[in-house]
Amino acid sequence: MAGAKEIRSKIASIKSTQKITSAMEKVAVSKMRKAQMRMAASRPYAERIRQVIGHLANANPEYRHPFMIERPVKRVGYVVVSSDRGLCGGLNTNLFKTLVKDMAVNRENGVEIDLCVVGSKGAAFFRNFGGNVVAAISHLGEEPSINDLIGSVKVMLDAYLDGRIDRLSVVSNKFINTMTQQPTVEQLIPLVATPDQGLKHHWDYLYEPDAKELLDGLMVRYVESQVYQAVVENNAAEQAARMIAMKNATDNAGDLISDLQLIYNKARQAAITQEISEIVGGAAAV
């Protein structure tokens, strides 16, 4: 029965792991709902300011903010939003694949790259992969604050204003639904007018007290809001991916337990049959 004992031990071990993954699934469900609420609360502001900025990109203001001016691209910056923890399926891996592909296109064109990394997984990836990380922040927790991001974002904005980078993009996972998280690369600056806005409307604004003072503040708030929204959505995507990963792990553990239980029963039956045969053989010999 040595084989049966070993199988029994494996079954007990897998059942213990199954309890852990099941508990983690339930925790992820709760955290995902809270993350979705935060995402829904911040999304209207992020979308509205994006619309206003889109109108500005099509307008002809008396003051052209540096974020509104296209220039030859020699160096680009990425704000990479990753998670702090693992056990969330291929969420970070898919994000890094998308980013590396975009970086490869830039490098083929002779464009250099600077990185601002949000999240421990992103920092660990670029330590191994290589890259010029100029700013990093991690351990934002389950309720990230925009105040925690301002310092890192400012590093990239200052680099753009000083002419050290010519384009800034944010890389993150978009929360589509519970089953789908989409890695995206979105250009933040210089501003990009959406085609629909460009075709249908041309907007002009009156600025008070003056265009420079208003736009200087608005442009910074725009970038900060988009990065914060990316962090909040990535957090919701992380919890959804973790919930699915833990559910799959729990289900797979159940299937493995069933298979091992069948093997155990067969091994036990074979051992009993052998014992009976030995008893019968011994009785016949007597």
UniProtKB/Swiss-Prot annotation:
Membrane topology classification: Peripheral membrane protein
Keywords: ATP synthesis, Cell inner membrane, Cell membrane, CF(1), Hydrogen ion transport, Ion transport, Membrane, Transport
Pfam families: ATP-synt
Gene Ontology molecular function: ATP binding; proton-transporting ATP synthase activity, rotational mechanism
One GO process term, biological-process aspect: proton motive force-driven plasma membrane ATP synthesis
GO CC annotations, alphabetized: plasma membrane; proton-transporting ATP synthase complex
Gene3D superfamilies, alphabetized: 3.40.1380.10, ATP synthase, gamma subunit, helix hairpin domain
UniProt superkingdom: Bacteria
Protein location: Cell inner membrane
Annotated PANTHER family: ATP SYNTHASE GAMMA CHAIN, ATP SYNTHASE SUBUNIT GAMMA, MITOCHONDRIAL
NCBIfam families: ATPsyn_F1gamma, PRK05621.1-1
Function: Produces ATP from ADP in the presence of a proton gradient across the membrane. The gamma chain is believed to be important in regulating ATPase activity and the flow of protons through the CF(0) complex.
Stated name of the protein: ATP synthase gamma chain
Gene label: atpG
